[in-house]
Amino acid sequence: MSAAVVRRLALNSPRHTIISRRAVHLQPLCGQQYVKSKLRNWTCLTFLGESVTAGSSIPLRKDAKPFKLAVKDNIATADFPTQCASQILSSHPSPFEATVVRQLRERGASIVGKTNMDEFGMGSHSTNSIHGAVRNPLAEDDDVSAGGSSGGSAVAVRLGDADVALGTDTGGSIRLPAAYTGTVGYKPSYGMISRFGVVPYANSLDTVGFLASEVKPIHDLVFKTGLYQEHDSSDPTSLPIASRKRCAETTPSTLPDLSKLNIGIPLEYNIEELDPSIRDAWVAAASALEAQGATLVPISLPSTTEALCAYYVLAPAEASSNLAKYDGVRYGKRGEGSDAVGETLYSDTRGAGFGDEVKRRILLGTYSLSSEAMDNYFIQAQKVRRMVQQDFDRVFRLDNPLYEPAQFDLSDMAEATGMEDKRGPLQVDFILCPTAPTFPPRLDEIKEQSSVDVYMNDVFTVPASLAGLPAVSVPAKVEGSRFPAGLQVIGQYWDDQRVLLLAEKLKEAVA
């Protein structure tokens, strides 16, 4: 199918409107050892002085190569406080180090600092932080969003202060900042990279990922050093070794010639709110892949329209449980109230320690889990999440290695529907779509937006998060704009290596 046909069917006339919204994560750290880089118009907080090789007691692997690493401030490090950009964890020292940080130290990482973010990862613009908003370095004379919640990590990479940066992606918190800052953002398959030592926002969605200026450093770090093979017994969501072997056996590790690949163009991602320049970049990228031999196939992912709504029920529900521990007794900076009255102590501590967006999501999540709302909201959102997973499984050529093909649920389709329509043609190897519907907004514009408007930034990133799929955002040049467009490659579960390899080819084609 030619690019012209795909353009006519999928891109030219937007037929879909957004019925859902969402947000992300980003955080910094502070203390007397840190300094804000105001000269560069951002608030990523970095270590003042030499890079920290410590954890220097950690033995290096034989294949270790030195590189500079920035770490998002919700990932525990032994040498820096872990504050999640929150007053309630101000100057909190971590008693241990995250598994992924240790793994990267073994591979030669020197930590240059912790990066600013949205408080506890709740936000899409890295503005909900006790350290101030992160600013986009692509707009030197303007205050523009760097995306969230891993905005500080993206900026550290963009400015060259770090070769690789760690972030977390719950609903797009790595990919959105990558799109806004012109960097590469990779969200691995859920369960591939250890979450031990990551301050949780939503356990079933949180995924540790990577940002860099190019795809290759990420690919080499994850696959050439065998990071993707390492199970962590300390993390109950880390995929077991037996499951990793099964996934590896069913998933190719090399990318064939593009003439043998089918690239899916999802119709539902062509929404009315999509900026025309980003739509043009999407079309140009699809055409570039077709010119190299790939076949473009329009596909339908009908549950996309409900994905954002489901995310903003499920993620806050999990957050309300995860953040209950911050009460001034077990964790968190204690409020000023009397210790004798428990209710006052808790309310004073949480009222003063949490920011407005965190409070909003705690309240939303608590309500979703209440007896009056559980069936109508939380359970329904779980059903939508399963439908999103089924949509992806139906269009990918590879079967999901976590499920037996016979387990595919067709009960929600009409009896008269033919089997070929139920399963779909299974003809797509990868999906190509925008990362964000718009270019980064100014910070003063964000202040005037409603929470729902802010959540809408994640409409293209949330579906892959709900399904636990690998996704990579790469920048595409846009004529007449100082900002690139973020384009996203999504693959079947555990097809991460080929997703990265295709993303590398895509980045070269649209540079």
Swiss-Prot record:
Function recorded in the entry: Allows the formation of correctly charged Gln-tRNA(Gln) through the transamidation of misacylated Glu-tRNA(Gln) in the mitochondria. The reaction takes place in the presence of glutamine and ATP through an activated gamma-phospho-Glu-tRNA(Gln).
BP GO annotations: glutaminyl-tRNAGln biosynthesis via transamidation; mitochondrial translation
A GO cellular component entry from the record: glutamyl-tRNA(Gln) amidotransferase complex
Gene3D superfamilies, per database record: Amidase signature (AS) domain (3.90.1300.10)
Gene Ontology MF terms: ATP binding; glutaminyl-tRNA synthase (glutamine-hydrolyzing) activity
Family in the record: Belongs to the amidase family. GatA subfamily.
Name of this protein: Glutamyl-tRNA(Gln) amidotransferase subunit A, mitochondrial
Top-level taxonomic group: Eukaryota
Ligase keyword on record: yes
Enzyme Commission identifier(s): 6.3.5.7
Top-level enzyme category: ligase
Keywords: ATP-binding, Ligase, Mitochondrion, Nucleotide-binding, Protein biosynthesis
Catalytic activity: L-glutamyl-tRNA(Gln) + L-glutamine + ATP + H2O = L-glutaminyl-tRNA(Gln) + L-glutamate + ADP + phosphate + H(+)
Chief subcellular location: mitochondrion
Residues of the active site: K72 (charge relay system), S149 (charge relay system), S173 (acyl-ester intermediate)
Keyword Ligase part of the UniProt annotation: yes
Natural source organism: Fusarium vanettenii (strain ATCC MYA-4622 / CBS 123669 / FGSC 9596 / NRRL 45880 / 77-13-4) (Fusarium solani subsp. pisi)
